[in-house]
């Protein structure tokens, strides 16, 4: 009764959701399948409960162990495509051309964030006002995290990797009007 995971599972089995709305559109079978797909891990037992623990954790030799939980697999499958800035390296660089390219890139990335969030499990079940609020409060963090991740992944954090066609090193950044 005191285990939060067990209480959550029982509430979900009864048709309750975190947002406070009941599953009106879903039948009980769909709800149970969704709960099975995103299983809550059981608490680990103490050493004196080893017999009960071995009864809960038994694997047959031919049973495969999942390396990635279903939620991680889902997130990997909805990973957004690579977005290009449309920056023309052949033209002389001016602060307005760089700023224009960054604005166009931010617009494309924002659309990508909205599309990505709509494909997240449970996001569309939220009220539309809640969806808008979540995107309003998180878009900048998601975009900055994406910039940091791309910079780390592609150029080992030595440059700012905005897009494959717009990578700024420290010297180029100092030469731009953004640095001062």
Curated annotation (Swiss-Prot):
Residues reported in the UniProt entry to bind progesterone: 150
InterPro entries: NHR-like_dom_sf (IPR035500), Nucl_hrmn_rcpt_lig-bd (IPR000536), Nuclear_hormone_rcpt_NR3 (IPR050200), Nuclear_hrmn_rcpt (IPR001723)
Assigned keywords, A-Z: Cytoplasm, DNA-binding, Lipid-binding, Lipoprotein, Metal-binding, Nucleus, Palmitate, Phosphoprotein, Receptor, Steroid-binding, Transcription, Transcription regulation, Ubl conjugation, Zinc, Zinc-finger
PROSITE patterns cross-referenced by the UniProt entry: NR_LBD
Zinc finger (NR C4-type): 1-11
DNA-binding region listed in the record: 1-16
Cellular localisation: Nucleus; Cytoplasm
Chain ranges of the NR LBD domain: 63-180
Modified residues (Phosphoserine): 60
Gene Ontology MF terms in the entry: DNA binding; steroid binding; zinc ion binding
Description of post-translational modifications: Phosphorylated on multiple serine sites. Several of these sites are hormone-dependent.
A single cellular component GO annotation: nucleus
Disulfide bridge positions per record: none
Region AF2: start-end pairs: 71-180
Quaternary data: Interacts with SMARD1 and UNC45A. Interacts with CUEDC2; the interaction promotes ubiquitination, decreases sumoylation, and represses transcriptional activity. Interacts with PIAS3; the interaction promotes sumoylation of PR in a hormone-dependent manner, inhibits DNA-binding, and alters nuclear export. Interacts with SP1; the interaction requires ligand-induced phosphorylation by ERK1/2-MAPK. Interacts with PRMT2. Interacts with NCOA2 and NCOA1. Interacts with KLF9. Interacts with GTF2B.
Record remark: domains: Composed of three domains: a modulating N-terminal domain, a DNA-binding domain and a C-terminal ligand-binding domain.
Function according to Swiss-Prot or TrEMBL: The steroid hormones and their receptors are involved in the regulation of eukaryotic gene expression and affect cellular proliferation and differentiation in target tissues. Transcriptional activator of several progesteron-dependent promoters in a variety of cell types. Involved in activation of SRC-dependent MAPK signaling on hormone stimulation.
Family: Belongs to the nuclear hormone receptor family. NR3 subfamily.
Protein name: Progesterone receptor
Native source organism of the sequence: Notamacropus eugenii
Protein's gene: PGR
């Amino acid at each position: 009764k005191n285990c939060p995971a067990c209480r959550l599972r029982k509430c979900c089995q009864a048709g309750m959701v975190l947002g406070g709305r009941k599953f009106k559109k879903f039948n009980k079978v769909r709800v149970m399948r969704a709960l099975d797909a995103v299983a809550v891990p059981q608490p680990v037992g103490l050493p004196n409960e080893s017999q009960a623990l071995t009864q809960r954790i038994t694997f047959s030799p031919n049973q495969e162990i999942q390396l990635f939980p279903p939620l991680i697999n889902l997130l990997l499958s909805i990973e957004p495509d690579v977005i290009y800035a449309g920056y023309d390296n052949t033209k002389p660089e001016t602060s307005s051309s760089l700023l224009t390219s960054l604005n166009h890139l931010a617009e494309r990335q924002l659309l990508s964030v909205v599309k990505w969030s709509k494909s997240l499990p449970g996001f569309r079940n939220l009220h539309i006002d809640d969806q808008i609020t979540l995107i309003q409060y998180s878009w900048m963090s998601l975009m900055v995290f994406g910039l940091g991740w791309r910079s780390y992944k592609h150029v080992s954090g030595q440059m700012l990797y905005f897009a494959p066609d717009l990578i700024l090193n420290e010297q180029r950044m100092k030469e731009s009007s953004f640095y001062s």
